[in-house]
Structure formats: C-alpha cells, structure tokens
Amino acid sequence: MLYRKANECTLAAAGLTVRRECSQKYILMSERNVLYYIFSVVRLLLYPFALIYGAIVWLRNRLYDAGVSSSVEFIVPVISVGNLSVGGTGKTPHIEYLIRLLQYQFKVATMSRGYKRRTQGFILADETANALRIGDEPMQYYMKYPEVVVSVSEERMTGIPRLLQSAPDVDVILLDDAYQHRSVKPGLNILITDYQKPFYSDYILPYGRLREGRSAYKRADLIIVSKCPPAMSPEKAEQMKTSINPLAHQQVFFSGIDYDQPYDLFTKELVILREKNVVLVCCIARPEPLVHYLRDMAKDVHVLSYPDHHYFLSKDMEEIKETYENWNIGNKVVVTTEKDATRLHLQHKKLRSWGVPIIVLPINVRILFNQDQQFNDTILKYVDQAASEHREHTLY
C-alpha cells in the first residue's frame, strides 16, 4: 500500500488516468484497486492447485472414514483442539482455558507438535526445556502450569503411549492442533474457527486458507467461533450459527479475548500500561486486535511485527534495541505476548544487559452469551465419565 501522493507517471504505469489536481485519497483508493486486481489474478492462478490438493485431502479423509486407514482410540480421555485453516485462530488460549478448567480435578497432560522446534521425536518437558527444544507454545504451558505434564511429538499415535508410559497417572490428554491428525480418534473433538474468517466463507489451500474442505467440520463435537468482538450481538451469533449449519450432535460456542494484567518478564511484577509508550514486539498471525487494544490502553504504540513463531536473530535484537533507544520519548517499555516471550527469553542475557523493561501481556479466553457453564459442563462430563472408565480399566 502506497501512502505518498502519486504523480501522473505513477498513475500511467498503473493504467490509470487521473488529473494532477485529484485528491490523495482518490489516488490511494485507485492504488488499492490495482493491488486488489493483481491479488485476484494471482489467486485465480492458484485455483487449479487447490483442486489437486483438495482431491488428495478428500481421498485421505475417505480412506479414514471407510476404515481403510486406521485410527487409534485410547482408553484415557483425549480432547483434540484444532482448526481447519492455517494461521492463528487462538488455539493456545483455548488449551489454557481447558487446563484451568480441569487441572484441579484431574491430572492433565498436553501434547503438541512443537512447531519450529529444533528437535525431533517425543520429548517430555523438564527443567532443560526451552522454546528451541519443545516449541514456544508448549514452553508457555510448561512455564505457566507446573502441575501439567507437557509433551511434544510429531506423531500423536506413537507419542501418546510414550506419554502414558512416562506419566501413568495422567487422567486426560489435550491434543494441541490435532484436528487433521486422524490416526488418533479423540473422545472429544473441538474445532476453532476465526470470527473474521470463518471456515464456511473460506477456500482450500492455496486458493484460500483451509487445510481441508469445509465439510470436515462435521467431525467436530464442539465448534468455537473465536476472537469475537466484545459487542457482538446475539443476532450476529445466530446468523453465524446458521451459516455453520451444525449437525444434531454438535454444539456451537462463541469466545472472545480478555487481556490480563501485564507483568515484567524477569521480575514477574505487575505493570500498568496506561499512559506508557509501547514498543510492541510480536510474532503472531493476526496482531491487529492486540495493536488495537494497546492503542486504546497506552499513550502511543510503535509496532515491530515478525512472522509467526519467529526466532529472534541478532539483527532482530538490534532492531528492537535501536527502536527503543531512538524513540525520543519518555516512560517507554517493550511489550510482547506470552508466546513470544518464550522465544525472547532465549536472549535473556542480552535483554538483561540492556536494562530495557520487557513487559508480557497475557490473554485469556471468555465464553460469550453466558454459555460458559454449558461449555464447562460438557467438558467436565466427558472427562469425568471417560476418566472413571480409564481408572476402572487400569485396575484389572
């Protein structure tokens, strides 16, 4: 997107004829139209590849549905949390919601792929764990919930037996981002879809962002529309529910994000961001809601955005330092997310030497429209019943 005022040559190159006295706003709109046209053409060229990819995924699912490819069902309660699309739908805070709901009644374990970790195979998190070893999201679980058994494994089917062998007292396993891992049949399948880009209005890769076709939603037991705006109306929720078209056995819920109390990365002391000037360092798929929140909360915000799950290199650290030091303003801090903090912490010696305040902003999930009790009861009922059967089985 170009924000400078274009001249006639620039417009001619874009195939537009506009008088020199036209407004900058009109030029910006014209440039947007050109970019949208280019994007549409490129996307259209990707459509044949989407058909091929979609056919492969469809065949894979049919093989599982027909029993040709086998799925393993474990006696221990297994809850899968995943999505149909690539990118951030908010799986991590929903996993944390389930941890907080279950951890005081049951021994909880999580199993993630450990995306972008520098290791392979099954790993049980211990005191040697860091984001490089187990991935940023599992490291976040490990740091926040010491009573939870945190594990990573690319292959859930072989990883779960190893997890249970290492921690036989586990009552329930939460599978992170496992909706497409059909080699394991979960007892409860939770599908999360983003409010801004629900699966029913999206298309399969690479034409759209779906990992598999829209009809795959039928495998879910619970469907959560995530990142809903605080002022979302019941009418809008009902409209989206109609578009989802849930099956008889499916329940649909809506969730929003609540930002929790910020704290210092090293001292863990609580911090108030109001009236502070913020350098936001984030590596998340959709940072816009976070930026919007900070612009409302803080005095001013400077954004440094990196790719999702990005590991900070020396040049990135220098960019953060220079941005902070060169911002000629007082009462300033660096703010990051909990997930990004696990990777920033790998550079803790350098960060401490700077003397720059690094503030972590946690987020929590909230179930909307007073449906939290219904959601909680559904989860607890399944786990309680399945865990009881698991305990009875282990006695014999």
Whereabouts are the PLM-identified features?
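Residue-level signal for inorganic ion chemistry
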Residues: 52, 92, 141, 176, ...
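Phosphate/Mg2+-binding loops and adjacent switch elements
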Residues: 114-248
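ATP-dependent carboxylate-amine ligase
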Residues: 24, 30-36, 184-191, 195-396
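A transmembrane-helix-recognition feature enriched in membrane-embedded lipid enzymes
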Residues: 29-74, 371, 382, 390, ...
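Walker A (P-loop) phosphate-binding motif
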Residues: 62-127, 230, 396
